Amino acid sequence: MAKYDISKQALEDLYKIWEYTVDTWSETQADKYYQLLENAMDEIGSNPQKTGKPYDEIITGLKGYHAGKHLVFYIIQENSRAFIVRILHEKMDYKRHF
């Protein structure tokens, strides 16, 4: 069972990343990269307080964890579970997507 919750938007981000990787490289590469992102989300879920870097300038309490060429953005919920909000490419203007 996942140790985190994930937003609909983050699921869409994940799908778009997978689709882009299939179109650009291959399904095998897309599956590997998807697994890398899934592992990052598992790591966030295991220790959300100590994982990630603060991005309070975007949203108070927002944290980001670098995985491959993407940042997994999340907040820590009242129940101490991570809530994955977005998964964005490292070169994106993050503020535009929140």
Question: For each predicted feature, which ranges?
Answer:
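Compact soluble domain cores
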Residues: 38-42
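Basic/aromatic recognition patch in beta-strand/loop cores that engages polyanionic ligands
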Residues: 50-79
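Short proline/glycine- and basic residue-enriched helix-capping loop/turn segments at helix->loop/beta transitions
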Residues: 45-48
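A generic structural signal for ordered secondary structure
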Residues: 18-21, 30-34, 59-62, 67, ...
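Arg/Lys-rich, positively charged N-terminal/basic patches that mediate binding to nucleic acids
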Residues: 1-36
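Enriched for short, Lys/Arg-rich terminal
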Residues: 71-98
